Amino acid sequence: MSDLQGRKVFKVFNQDFIVDERYNVTKELGQGAYGIVCAATNVHTGEGVAIKKVTNVFSKKILAKRALREIKLLQHFRGHRNITCLYDMDIPRPDNFNETYLYEELMECDLAAIIRSGQPLTDAHFQSFIYQILCGLKYIHSANVLHRDLKPGNLLVNADCELKICDFGLARGFSIDPEENAGYMTEYVATRWYRAPEIMLSFQSYTKAIDVWSVGCILAELLGGRPFFKGRDYVDQLNQILHYLGTPNEETLSRIGSPRAQEYVRNLPFMPKIPFQRLFPNANPDALDLLDRMLAFDPASRISVEEALEHPYLHIWHDASDEPTCPTTFDFHFEVVDDVQEMRKMIYDEVVRFRNLVRQQSQAQAAAAAQQQQQQIAQQTNVPIPDHQQGGWKQEEPKPQEVHAAGGHVNDLESSLQRGMDVQ
């Protein structure tokens, strides 16, 4: 193992998992199409981290682009309290490598597991979760970035209800110019249940409102204890949205970019909107008002993140001075790169640069800590470290999977809705 100097090998989900020698793997957390995740502990400090092994990075161009995007965005958003923190990265075998390791903040579970567990949640929990999602989203949007895959499974939570947004692999840039936005919906495969209707219906442009729709779906899921628009396929997804929200007005219908989808909606019988109070009779009226504004069918009528933060439902949490924006916008120019080998070099360079950065920071922090320790010794102080209880939810269920379309139900329309803005 001379080629793995300074590292150790563990078996995680029957795969070699190569970690920095400072860490011991303690628990398998999950596996999916993009890799495997485990919990690990720093043997010197006792600090826990989540280590994600991103596998088969260069087997497909789309996977390489997704990995590069995730790495860049996690660095750009590093430091916001409601976005998962990237601690370190590693490429143990850099020669023609096909996997990358990301060391991230360790959280206890995701919001999907909490909802599925049936653990009793109060209105105060709902307010806290939605507020934190919006704070993170405000920061993301201010960098001209759309997350595009907000769902309970991508919201990490601790026992103290601290929430952090993760998984930026599907994120895209946002421009005020609609022409620039129109081309960005290629390969858009976000979870169907949280996908805004304007994506399926191929509106001529898209906005930050697509993420607000997803937050509305999450709020409805919290209120009801289950996914709100749980379509079996894309046609059923659209039908469920129309069933609850009612038939769109003519101005909205005219902006549906897919002729097939527009014809389908126009040929449906008129449907009135079902009041959310009837669907969630025990909910806080302010929660239902916010939900109504988030789940506006027309994106132009949907509430913005900034407006949502000022909504009465969140007044107990809202503090404009403590809801920062990102100091710099994110540069998506790397998206034009199509050569896999060039992306391989870009990922390697990102990892090396970040590793050097965090190690320089760590050395500076260690020096400062040593100086502080010397001062404490000189003052003969002895402050005990508190013993925090490691409580919380223990669910180990897999994250919700997409429900595949059942059969050839309105095949042409289904294909049109699935591809969204690719259909022009």
Curated annotation (Swiss-Prot):
Transmembrane segments: none annotated. GO terms for molecular function: ATP binding; MAP kinase activity; protein serine kinase activity. Disruption phenotype: Results in severe sensitivity against cell wall-disturbing compounds congo red or calcofluor white, and drastic alterations of the fungal morphology. Leads to reduced conidiation during asexual differentiation. Abolishes the production of fumiquinazoline C. Its EC number is 2.7.11.24. Activated by threonine and tyrosine phosphorylation by the upstreamm MAPKK mkk2. Its cofactor is Mg(2+). One of its GO terms (biological process) is cell integrity MAPK cascade. Keywords: ATP-binding, Kinase, Magnesium, Nucleotide-binding, Phosphoprotein, Serine/threonine-protein kinase, Transferase. It comes from the Eukaryota. Gene3D superfamilies: Phosphorylase Kinase, domain 1, Transferase(Phosphotransferase) domain 1. Residues 375-424 are annotated as: Disordered. One of its GO terms (cellular component) is cytoplasm. It catalyses: L-seryl-[protein] + ATP = O-phospho-L-seryl-[protein] + ADP + H(+); L-threonyl-[protein] + ATP = O-phospho-L-threonyl-[protein] + ADP + H(+). Residues 23-314 form the Protein kinase domain. ATP binds at residues 29-37, 52. Phosphorylated by the upstreamm MAPKK mkk2. Phosphorylation is induced during asexual development. Phosphorylation is regulated by rlmA. SMART domains: S_TKc (SM00220). Induction: Expression is induced by cell wall-disturbing compounds. PROSITE patterns: MAPK, PROTEIN_KINASE_ATP, PROTEIN_KINASE_DOM, PROTEIN_KINASE_ST. Mitogen-activated protein kinase; part of cell wall integrity (CWI) signaling pathway composed of pkcA, the bck1-mkk2-mpka MAPK cascade and the downstream rlmA transcription regulator. The CWI signaling pathway regulates cell wall integrity and pyomelanin formation. CWI also controls oxidative stress response, gliotoxin production, iron adaptation and asexual development. Finally, CWI is constitutively required for A.fumigatus to cope with the temperature increase found in the mammalian lung environment, during infection. Belongs to the protein kinase superfamily. Ser/Thr protein kinase family. Interacts with flbB, flbC, brlA, and rasB. Interacts with fmqA and fmqC. Interacts with hsp90. PANTHER family: MITOGEN-ACTIVATED PROTEIN KINASE. This is Mitogen-activated protein kinase mpkA. It comes from Aspergillus fumigatus (strain ATCC MYA-4609 / CBS 101355 / FGSC A1100 / Af293).
